[in-house]
Swiss-Prot record:
Assembly description: Component of SCF(VBF) E3 ubiquitin ligase complex that interacts with VIP1. Interacts directly with SKP1A and VIP1. Forms a complex composed of VIP1, VBF and Agrobacterium virE2.
PANTHER family to which the protein is assigned, alphabetical: F-BOX DOMAIN-CONTAINING PROTEIN, F-BOX PROTEIN PP2-B13-RELATED
Domain F-box: 1-44
Gene encoding the protein: VBF
Traits of the deletion mutant: Impaired Agrobacterium-mediated tumor formation.
Name of the protein in question: F-box protein VBF
A Pfam family hit: PP2
Organism: Arabidopsis thaliana
Job description of the protein: Component of SCF(VBF) E3 ubiquitin ligase complexes, which mediate the ubiquitination and subsequent proteasomal degradation of target proteins such as VIP1 and Agrobacterium virE2, after their implication in T-DNA translocation to the host nucleus (can functionally replace Agrobacterium VirF). Required during Agrobacterium-induced tumor formation.
CDD domains, A to Z: F-box_AtSKIP3-like
Induction comment: By Agrobacterium.
Disulfide bonding pattern of the chain: none
């Protein structure tokens, strides 16, 4: 193997993974040269990477090396007038997207009495949406599978924060769903905020009968018997899993990702929406 010419090694590396190509430099100088070649990294770049770069709003693209382009895409890229965030996993090459709050459908989000829009310091997007008051929470995002990695199981996650003055978010679980035109369906339910035990005791005292009735309508308990709630992210936000779906080679499908809470009829507010992330499941 050590006696193989550089071009032959590059051909072999192109059929491995980005992780293997990154580590090849540790083998020998010939492997390092082969592992840095444009031929290898062209294989790992998304087929539409030039289009993605042309849509970029936060990079100056004067890089000639395909490996460096790959590294930049791993750092994430704002595209589509900064309404979407594109990213590839450094070691697997799998594609992820984040659809901003402006790029998804939020019922009544254009009415200032229901929602307010503002810049949030730890968001990559220029605006996030904060719920002021509503009795019907309906959120929907759409994505085409052709822009994602083929033959991959994906999860969709609503990125949120709950403000200190939030109310009405923990009385009734929200319903989540994933639907695609090819027939994939994933349905579940989750609470919109983490449940505080003291607040739960007060809620049961005042709303016990109503809560029992609603629990019969919307179940928000996972297979492990635990309540489904938002989970903390590394970026300071929280995420609510909406469901999962699979992509297939050569297939172009539209996936609808939704969260609704319309059965409780109670007023609610104080949840901040940053967008929906679509990423490969580990």
């Amino acid at each position: 193997m050590m006696m193989l010419p550089e071009a032959c090694i590059a051909n072999i590396l192109a059929f491995t993974s980005p992780a293997d190509a990154f580590s090849s430099s540790e083998v020998s100088s010939v492997f390092r040269l082969a592992g840095d070649s444009d031929f290898v990294w062209e294989k790992f770049l998304p087929s539409d990477y030039k289009s993605l770069i042309s849509q970029s709003t936060d990079h100056h693209w004067n890089i000639s090396s395909k490996k460096e382009i790959y590294r930049c895409l791993c750092d994430s890229l704002l595209i589509d007038n900064a309404r979407k965030l594109f990213k590839i996993n450094k070691f697997s090459g799998k594609i992820s997207y984040v659809l901003s709050a402006r790029d998804i459908s939020i019922t009544h989000s254009d009415h200032a009495s229901y929602w307010s829009w503002s810049n949030v310091s730890d968001s990559r997007f220029s605006e996030s949406a904060e719920l002021i008051i509503t009795d019907r929470l309906e959120i929907e995002g759409k994505i085409q599978t052709r822009v994602l990695s083929a033959n991959t199981r994906y999860g969709a996650y609503l990125i949120v924060k709950v403000t200190k003055g939030a109310y009405g978010l923990d009385l009734v679980p929200a319903e989540t769903s994933i639907k695609s035109k090819n027939g994939q369906i994933s349905k579940s339910a989750t609470y919109l905020c983490c449940l505080d035990e003291k607040k739960q005791q007060m809620k049961r005292l005042f709303y016990g009968n109503r809560e029992e009735r609603m629990a019969m309508t919307v179940e928000a308990v996972g297979g492990d018997g635990k309540r489904r709630e938002p989970k903390c992210r590394d970026d300071g936000w929280m995420e609510i899993e909406l469901g999962e779906f699979e992509t297939r080679e050569g297939e172009d499908d539209e996936v609808n990702m939704t969260l609704t809470e319309v059965k409780g009829y109670q007023l609610k507010g104080g949840i901040l929406i940053d967008g929906i992330e679509v990423r490969p499941k580990t």
